Amino acid sequence: MKKSLTVTVSSVLAFLALNNAAHAQQHGTQVKTPVQHNYVSNVQAQTQSPTTYTVVAGDSLYKIALEHHLTLNQLYSYNPGVTPLIFPGDVISLVPQNKVKQTKAVKSPVRKASQAKKVVKQPVQQASKKVVVKQAPKQAVTKTVNVAYKPAQVQKSVPTVPVAHNYNKSVANRGNLYAYGNCTYYAFDRRAQLGRSIGSLWGNANNWNYAAKVAGFKVDKTPEVGAIFQTAAGPYGHVGVVESVNPNGTITVSEMNYAGFNVKSSRTILNPGKYNYIH
C-alpha cells in the first residue's frame, strides 16, 4: 500500500509539472514581455544622453570629461578653440559638432570681456581730458588780476603850482558884492586869496562868461590851476575855482553852494571839457 501511495503522489506531481509547462507555452508572450521591456528602456536611456554641458563654478575640463566617460582629447576635439580656462555659463559639447558653431560658442564670452574692458577705459580717457581743460580758467584769472592792478597806478595825482597870467583886463573891484553863501561869493573871495581878483558886478554865474570877456579876461575851454570854471546850466549857472589838473585828464575844484547853501566843498570833475574857464 505504501508503494502504491508513493507512485500515486509522484504521478500527481508529474502531472502538475506537465500542466504548468503546457500553460507556460500557451502564454509564452507574457513571460518574454518583461525582458523585451527592459531592453527597450535601456535603448531609450542611451539615446537620451546629453549632447552639451553648461559649466558651473568649480568645474574643469578634466572633471567634465571624467563625469561623461570621455577623454580630454575627445573633449578638445569636440570643442575646437577651447582652453583649460573655462567660466561658469560656458557651453561644452559632449559630442562632435560643427567647428564654426563651437568656435563661436566658446569664444563669445571672451569677446564680450574684451569689449567690456574697452568701455571701462573710455571714461578714464575722457576724465583726463576734462582735467586739462580746467587749467584754462586759472590762466584767465591771473591775467585779470594783472590788468586790474594798473588803474591804481593811474590814480596818482601830481600837485601843480598856480601860475599867474597877466592880461589886459579892467577890474571894477569894489569888494565882494555878491550874495553871501552863493557860489559867486566864494569864487570872488578865492580868487582874491590867489591874488587874481575879478570884478564885483558880473551878476549871476550864468553871466560870468560874457562879463569876463568884456572885462578883458581870457576865456576858453582849457582848465588851469586858479582859473574859474563856469557853466550856464541851471536857473543861475554855477562857478568855482580849479585847484588841480590831474594827469588822467580830470580836475579837482573847490566851490560853494554845490553841497548845500553856504557849504564849501571840493570834488573831482571827470568831464572838464563841458565847462568854460576864466583865466
UniProtKB/Swiss-Prot annotation:
Enzyme Commission number(s) from the entry: 3.5.1.28
Domain LysM residues, every copy: 51-94
CDD domains noted in UniProt: LysM (cd00118)
InterPro entries on file: CHAP_dom, LysM_dom, LysM_dom_sf, Papain-like_cys_pep_sf
Catalytic activity: Hydrolyzes the link between N-acetylmuramoyl residues and L-amino acid residues in certain cell-wall glycopeptides
Peptidase C51 domain: residues covered: 158-279
Signal peptide: 1-24
Keywords: Antimicrobial, Bacteriolytic enzyme, Cell wall biogenesis/degradation, Hydrolase, Signal
One annotated GO molecular function: N-acetylmuramoyl-L-alanine amidase activity
GO BP annotations, alphabetical order: cell wall organization; defense response to bacterium; killing of cells of another organism
Reported function: Has weak lytic activity toward S.aureus cells.
UniProt protein name: Probable autolysin LDP
